[in-house]
Amino acid sequence: EGTNLMGEVAGKEKPEVLMTLAELNRLLEADLKGWPQYEWKDGRTLVIMRQGKRYEIDTDKKVLVYVFPIAKGAQNVTSNGQELLAYTKANNLYYVDANGNEFAVTSDKDPNIVNGQTVSRNEFGINGGIFWSPDGKQLAFYRKDESQVGTFPLLDINSRMGTLREIKYPMAGMKTQQNS
């Protein structure tokens, strides 16, 4: 419905307005003309990454639950549902508290050692490589040793002149990574 975020509510015949763009702009202190990319954390918490921050918004109460600063280059970002955020930068894993203090979980210098990233290309129904305990106090993650895996060239067509970028890719019948 234009500038409204709509949702189906069990037992109701018509979709309901979950949040308006005006409400979102008020919470983000922004002047968005349309809805940014978002994902659902649970049935009522909306997650938006914008301008170096991760916003968690309670759509029922129309309030910001958490605002996390995100380091430049952070990937695989995940929240513990409380006041901690974990992510990867390069091949290492970090977490940050609600005050923006960053802590290194790993410090591997070898580019063949990858922490906190998906293994096996999101196969077997597992998405991601960082997992919070149910109480949000402990962090589990995959550690992948790709030192025996061959490289595979990919063509990056986003640049004006296509450029090659190499990734580690275990071809069938060849050595694969060791996960721990």
Regions found by a protein language model. Name each.
Residues 1-180:
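Beta-propeller folds
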